[in-house]
Amino acid sequence: MKPTSLNSSSSRQTWSADTYSEHGRFVADLAGAVFEWLAPQAREKILDLGCGDGALTQKIADTGADVLGLDMSNDLLSAARKRGLSVRSGDGHALDFSAEFDAVFSNAALHWMSMPEKVIHGISRALKPGGRFVAEFGGHGNVAAIVTAMRAVGARRGGDQSLAGPWFFPSPEVYSEMLSDASFDVCRVELHPRPTSLKTGMKEWLKLFRKPFFEQFGDETDNVLDEVEQLLRPSLCDARGNWTADYVRIRVEAMKPR
């Protein structure tokens, strides 16, 4: 999952570029399939929605495309600028582009955006007629075991369980209908289970991606982390101590009519 902070102030996810690079690098590393779907071409104008630290934005730029990265995390945008990329701060719910892009691309960001219909309509406005929308993000069933464990511990401790799973993880049927309602021509929408190795362990994943859930427990944060990890150990950790997250991804390609 890749950063885009979009929730209210009390539950807002924040990001450190250094921490993300250390514990979340797999997000960009595992994006080969959706990048192939995008197939960027030289001189195309492309919007990378939820660009994060610019790892994939750089890959798009390397093809000769004219790419603009958009994100809400200033720290991650700073890291992207250090790569020499063109990026700006912006909310995926309030895209202010009009028929500017040949393609809109997004990897591991759309599940952070809680009003998907607004996002889809903004993407449609941003695209030129005949432009394409290509994205991958969390699909139905993504990190279900992890969220269930957090909710269980949160309930036992009297915490806000909603902070365990703030994401939008649609099925292909639901998302296809949303795209059609926004007048997109749906080319393909696929769901792919993708068990994902966590090289730095489950606790680092939890701290990186669900900080607001754990911080609500104050001085008990470390103990709550321990409890969630122990609940997950039997199903997501092997005999050698290697952790795997139960990722499920939805991959999308749609076209704006000419």
Q: Could you tell me what each predicted segment is?
A:
Residues C187-R240:
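C-terminal helical/coil "lid" or tail adjacent to the Rossmann-like core of SAM-dependent
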Residues F168-A182:
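Short alpha-helix
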Residues A103-P116:
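A short SAM/SAH-binding and catalytic strip from SAM-dependent methyltransferases
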Residues L47-L95:
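Class I SAM-dependent methyltransferase SAM/SAH-binding core
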Residues H93-V104:
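A short acidic, Gly/Pro-enriched loop at the edge of an enzyme's catalytic core
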Residues E117-R132:
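A short glycine-rich, Lys/Arg-flanked "PGG" loop and its adjoining helix->strand segment in the class I
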Residues M1-E44, A55-K59, L76-A79, V134-R157:
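Conserved class I S-adenosyl-L-methionine
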